[in-house]
């Protein structure tokens, strides 16, 4: 990981060089980009798998142009069979992440969904000890517990009647069953995103940005198309309004957001980028409250639970 350029020391204050500012500007733009994901998905009337497929398809058009212009596709010649297998696995997990998380937004609030899906750093910290032989410390387990408590509060906030109604809701009865289903799908989205990150991290160590996202986004696109065919989800034709939403998801959350953060990882410490990702629930919740088509204001319990999830995730991700 490269370091930022050294700034000469002088007695008078001087502006930060543009070369140093650029990664932070990209990171700020990326945060804005990913914050639009949940509100745009909520505004779409298409099936969750269809949204994911078109989002990836539009993204791949731009990725393909970047690969052809920059010649990054040549890096694929050096890939081993295990690399291709890993890329396919990461792509499938990304497809499952989009499917489960997109679906969660049909059942639960934007605030609850984005808070729960951002448990992924906690999940990574918890399973790293078993898979990567990087056991979590006692302090990390404490903050993992805090995040889990926050997730439980978010779930209870979605159930009218609180703890007494949780049993019937889990059995599919009562008004809270739909919200709990959405919360569960958001948690599955966090698990699949954590797996996508852990598997893809190995590929990113020896693959440049565009070859990496080209492989993984391509595998995810194929997986989404196959899932659409298997579930008979209508891929086409789509009305202009939906196509505009799909293009917005590709340009904002996908390319500006996720790809911008992948670029920033080469210029900034990983923990800085990870902390920025955890700003998504704040941005998404504000947008969901302000956009006329959604106008969704979270309740106090959701805010408290979400704050615990984010605090636990931030501190559990640090060693």
Which residues does each predicted region cover?
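Hydrophobic transmembrane alpha-helices of multi-pass small-molecule transport proteins
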Residues: 63, 67, 127, 136-159, ...
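Glycine-/small-residue-enriched transmembrane alpha-helix faces in small-molecule transporters
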Residues: 1-54, 59, 66, 89-96, ...
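Hydrophobic alpha-helical transmembrane segments of multi-pass integral membrane proteins
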Residues: 21-26, 50-69, 142-149, 181-188, ...
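Hydrophobic/small/kink-forming positions within alpha-helical transmembrane segments
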Residues: 32-35, 57, 91, 95-99, ...
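C-terminal-most transmembrane helix of multi-pass membrane proteins
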Residues: 4, 56, 156-157, 242-244, ...
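Helix-helix packing/entry segments at the starts of transmembrane helices
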Residues: 113-119, 199-221, 254-290
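Specific transmembrane alpha-helical segments of multi-pass solute transporters/efflux pumps
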Residues: 33, 72-111, 116-117, 153, ...
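Specific alpha-helical transmembrane segments that line the substrate/conduction pathway
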Residues: 50-61, 102-135, 140, 144, ...
């Amino acid at each position: 990981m490269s370091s930022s350029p050294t700034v000469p020391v002088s007695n008078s204050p001087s502006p930060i060089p543009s070369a140093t500012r650029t990664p932070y500007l990209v990171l700020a733009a990326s945060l804005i980009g990913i914050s639009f994901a949940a509100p745009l998905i909520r505004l779409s009337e298409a099936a969750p798998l269809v949204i994911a497929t078109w989002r990836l398809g539009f993204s791949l058009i731009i990725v393909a142009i970047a690969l052809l212009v920059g010649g990054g596709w040549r890096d694929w010649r050096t890939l081993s069979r295990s690399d291709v297998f890993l890329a396919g696995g990461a792509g499938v997990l990304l497809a499952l992440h989009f499917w489960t998380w997109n679906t969660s937004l049909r059942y639960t609030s934007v605030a609850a969904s984005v808070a729960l899906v951002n448990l992924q750093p906690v999940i990574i910290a918890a399973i790293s000890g078993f898979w990567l032989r990087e056991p979590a410390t006692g302090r990390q387990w404490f903050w993992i517990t805090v995040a889990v408590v926050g997730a439980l509060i978010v779930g209870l906030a979605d159930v009218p009647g609180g703890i007494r109604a949780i049993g019937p809701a889990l059995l599919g009865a009562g008004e809270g069953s739909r919200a709990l289903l959405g919360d569960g799908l958001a948690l599955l989205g966090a698990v699949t995103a954590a797996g996508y990150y852990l598997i893809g991290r190995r590929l990113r160590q020896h693959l440049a940005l565009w070859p990496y996202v080209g492989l993984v986004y391509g595998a995810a696109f194929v997986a989404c198309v196959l899932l659409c065919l298997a579930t008979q989800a209508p891929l086409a034709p789509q009305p202009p309004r939906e196509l505009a939403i799909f293009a917005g998801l590709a340009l904002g959350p996908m390319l500006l957001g996720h790809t911008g953060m992948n670029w920033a990882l080469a210029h900034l410490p990983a923990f800085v980028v990870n902390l920025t990702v955890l700003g998504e629930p704040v941005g998404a919740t504000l947008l969901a409250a302000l956009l006329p088509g959604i106008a969704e204001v979270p309740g106090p319990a959701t805010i408290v639970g979400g704050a615990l999830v984010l605090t636990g995730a931030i501190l559990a991700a640090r060693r």
